Amino acid sequence: MGTEGKAGRKLLFLFTSMILGSLVQGKGSVYTAQSDVQVPENESIKLTCTYSGFSSPRVEWKFVQGSTTALVCYNSQITAPYADRVTFSSSGITFSSVTRKDNGEYTCMVSEEGGQNYGEVSIHLTVLVPPSKPTISVPSSVTIGNRAVLTCSEHDGSPPSEYSWFKDGISMLTADAKKTRAFMNSSFTIDPKSGDLIFDPVTAFDSGEYYCQAQNGYGTAMRSEAAHMDAVELNVGGIVAAVLVTLILLGLLIFGVWFAYSRGYFERTKKGTAPGKKVIYSQPSTRSEGEFKQTSSFLV
């Protein structure tokens, strides 16, 4: 009770100081008692905004989520997209039911009608949503000595989930995980934010069954399906056999070309001509004028 009383007195002192300061300086002050608000999805919440030092205040509320900006309240009036579930009062705005799309930063902006006086305050709203069942991507087979990346993700949790990995039912995220017998000869890193499990390099001890878990501090932690990964040796014998087969085929091709050339096949092809029509012309015998007879003959 004593702690709550001290906090209340401190809050009252801060608020009083802001009011007195605004009166002395002739400037308006805008204040909120809740700069960071968390509320479960589908419940109601009021975002408060208190101001002083404005003779004729005009209040606006702005919503920012990433690169998206929207007006919730303009000139003390709720805008159309929010009209069915948000109400305005001089002390703030009230959501009748929030969804995960309402996550973001809300700014209360107060100004004079003439624009000579201005103040603002921001409130970060987090809509609490438990994580859904995560999905994983695990290669069924990886070569020892190579790099392997296993991924885990879910897209419903708010705030965003953090991820942990398990191999054969043993947690890999604990500080002493690499000191245990199961992971002593393994080289891996885990990014709890992205959900990536990276082996670099893969060792023979990394074969096993893997699954991940997602949790965000709200609701129940969710576990993925399990998937098996095999760490296999590089198939040197197969590579050597493939190279030998390639060399044999190349040798046979070279021998075939040499054999055809040695038998004169290419020379005959180059010098030979396709059989065609032959024309034989014989000189006509001397005859008297007027007696003409064709004596040319054509052989085909």
Swiss-Prot record:
Residues 260-299 are cytoplasmic. It is a single-pass type I membrane protein. It comes from the Eukaryota. It holds the Pfam family Ig_3. GO terms for molecular function: integrin binding; PDZ domain binding; protein homodimerization activity. The modification Phosphoserine is found at residues 282, 285, 288. Residues 27-238 are extracellular. Belongs to the immunoglobulin superfamily. Seems to play a role in epithelial tight junction formation. Appears early in primordial forms of cell junctions and recruits PARD3. The association of the PARD6-PARD3 complex may prevent the interaction of PARD3 with JAM1, thereby preventing tight junction assembly. Plays a role in regulating monocyte transmigration involved in integrity of epithelial barrier. Ligand for integrin alpha-L/beta-2 involved in memory T-cell and neutrophil transmigration. Involved in platelet activation. This is Junctional adhesion molecule A.
